[in-house]
Amino acid sequence: LEKHAKRAVDDMNPLRALNLFQRISTTDVELLGMDPSRGRPEAFIWQYLPAPPVAIRPSVAQEAASTEDDITNKLGDIIQINTLLSAGLKSGQPVMKIIDMWEFLQVQIAMYIDGNLPGLGRDSAYGKALRGFCQRLKGKQGRFRGNLSGKRVDFSGRTVISPDPN
């Protein structure tokens, strides 16, 4: 029982979850109802962060200067923290500092996706509510209701349901 007590309180981090998912055999993946040739469970853990093209996150011109889009600013923060984390690992910084940077990186990536996270509503560096990907897609001004569901949209995959003329 002593040797199992340590495992009971062990933290589950993304790297450990990825390792566990990668060790699932092909037959077990099929038992989970997944097709191993099309996708495996480890595909659900991001290993690379998608960065949209500049056309999706344009600079906004103001009177004296231009400001970058929220997603561009957040990508810059993520790159900076990732660089500091890599340098800290190479230089042998204390474990607590590495853990703090790792957790801060996770928070920044979560805000990159959804800017309205509970407890993290505003970004303290910019002093305003961030518009992450979720805010750009949902709501009245979002991509779906604001652009794709309008009356004058062609090639959006919508069909018109009408009664049978016979």
Which residues does each predicted region cover?
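Conserved core architecture of multi-subunit DNA-directed RNA polymerases
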Residues: 1-166
